Amino acid sequence: MRWDVVGFILGWTIRLVALPLAVVAAYSCYLDSEGYEFAMRAYLIPLILAAAVGQSLVSLARGADIASRLRDREAFASVALGWIPVVVLGALPYWLGGVFYGPAELSMDSVAVTDVMSGAIHSWFESMSGFTTTGSTVIDHATSPRCTDGSDCISSQPQSLILWRSLTQWLGGMGVIMLGLLILSQALGGGMSLARAELTGPSLSRLGPSLQWTARRLWTIYIVLTIIEMMLLRFVGEMGLFDSVNYALTTLSSGGFGTSDSGIMAFDSARIEVILMIFMV
């Protein structure tokens, strides 16, 4: 196994996670009620970690002829191992941001170390559910310190964390590794080994003359459809801007995360349901 090749690909994948983290950090600072201190704790730490670890792995292999040394075994190892750091980075905002019991909650008299450990497991589950578009959630009154009796548990979370939750599903819908292919196929050439490891369904012969061209086209379509759905939900379904953005992100990926405990039922709108059904297909 050529571990420097695997490390290079993992480094690129990890660095890509920093971009959506920067988006939610900016949202938290300027539009969310939690402010700068919360943004630094929940997002800046994983953002710096993603950038530093990713850059370190890429730098270790710099100068090596990665393209000619990339074989199927390195590609399969990269895809399999790539999910681990991606999910860990995705879990940190939940754990550090207080969706589940984390280090910040240790100052509470009723919180034990075992609660913080359970919070880490819950955060991992929520992140994995998002990136794999499973749609299961463990955010409830028993697991989240932000939920109070009689409150809507999910909507009680900071908006930036709800947005991060939706972004994990949107990225997972197309495949976070596929996003890496878009860059790596240009940087390395010969991204077909990675494609064989990540993609299922259509044969590679039908993916088009260039993997990079195919990946760019798929992501362009994905982004355009997301924007169209968001606008339809906002102006035809008369959904609020924040809700329309989140449901567009999670519907197109067929993930199912919502912005409240009741999900779509909270809107009680046939127009919204029709729009969502169309884009879920």
Which functions belong to the PLM regions below?
Residues 1-281:
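Membrane-proximal intracellular helices of multi-pass ion channels
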